[in-house]
């Protein structure tokens, strides 16, 4: 009988892991904000009931791998575009997803040791641990290669944006994890506790959607005209000097079409500049284009300033880098 129960628990945990990983991925990929508030509840429920640390490691790897396979799916067509074999591309995605899933071991390890302290301690530890790892991922990315994009708060970009002014993305992440961890822990607890959490969550979620509506519907006294240019530069031509003039000509054509339209801000795609913005010739060419439009430009470019990074530069109508 105990074997049957153990197998049933394993199947249940696997289903919960699958549900959480797929739901969270849908929240990111298809902008389904509400899933950001619900996706982790089954996962946290499984974690809360585990008494062996090796199972925490298994859950971490399983959830992380399944989530990142979906979140980083674009790596396969990107590698294929570069001539990499389909099987090698799939292997690269699987290996990267397994590596990325390591972060969840660090997230779930600390709450495991706080499980016996009850709902408040476990939920607060889970929220703190998750938020800390999100913060560290961004800091680590300044010195090493990692993927810090998937902050839980990003799933709420259409709803909780006004609140980031007060608490930042880390505050949003903390609240979302705290809510879901509390729900998961309280499923088998007293009904009064569950009711309080549900009422509080309904208040937070409804107020976030209301604030979005109020902010978006508030008339603005000042209007600006924004243009977005898209030169569609082939990445494999990007660093080939034989195509340098061709890329410049395409960008010049796009900029020329904006000259008489009184644009206030021109936004370039990430890394669209044909070369390094630090190079004197490239920057001089860029300044001429900026002055033609008499507008501010946000330009994405690789830069040697403080290391080699892709950065966004705000350039004034006079051709000076402001930020």
Role assignments for model-derived ranges:
Residues 2-213:
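Membrane-embedded alpha-helical bundles of multi-pass enzymes
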């Amino acid at each position: 009988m105990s074997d049957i129960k153990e197998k049933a628990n394993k199947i249940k945990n696997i289903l919960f892991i699958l549900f959480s990983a797929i739901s969270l991925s849908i929240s990111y990929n298809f902008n389904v904000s509400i899933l950001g508030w619900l996706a982790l509840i089954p996962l946290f429920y499984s974690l809360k009931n585990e008494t062996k640390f090796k199972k925490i490691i298994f859950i971490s790897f399983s959830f992380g791998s399944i989530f990142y396979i979906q979140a980083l799916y674009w790596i396969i067509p990107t590698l294929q575009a570069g001539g990499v074999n389909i099987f090698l591309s799939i292997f690269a995605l699987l290996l990267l997803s397994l590596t990325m899933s390591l972060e969840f071991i660090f997230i779930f390890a600390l709450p495991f040791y706080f499980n016996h302290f009850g709902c408040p301690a476990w939920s607060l530890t889970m929220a703190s641990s998750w938020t800390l790892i999100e913060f560290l991922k961004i800091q680590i990315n300044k010195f090493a290669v990692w993927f810090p994009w998937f902050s839980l708060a990003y799933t709420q970009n259409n709803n909780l944006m006004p609140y980031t002014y007060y608490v930042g993305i880390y505050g949003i992440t903390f609240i979302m994890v705290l809510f879901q961890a509390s729900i998961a822990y309280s499923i088998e607890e007293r009904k009064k506790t569950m009711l309080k959490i549900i009422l509080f969550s309904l208040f937070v979620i409804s107020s976030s959607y209301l604030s979005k509506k109020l902010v978006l519907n508030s008339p603005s006294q000042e209007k600006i005209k924004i243009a977005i240019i898209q030169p569609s530069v082939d990445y494999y031509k990007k660093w080939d000097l034989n195509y340098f003039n061709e890329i410049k000509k395409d960008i010049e054509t796009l900029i020329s079409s904006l000259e008489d339209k009184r644009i206030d801000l021109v936004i370039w795609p990430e890394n669209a500049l044909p070369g390094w913005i630090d190079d004197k010739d490239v920057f001089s060419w860029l300044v001429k284009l900026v002055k033609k439009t008499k507008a501010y430009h946000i330009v994405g470019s690789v830069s040697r300033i403080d290391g080699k990074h892709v950065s966004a530069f705000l350039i004034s109508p006079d051709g000076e880098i402001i930020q």
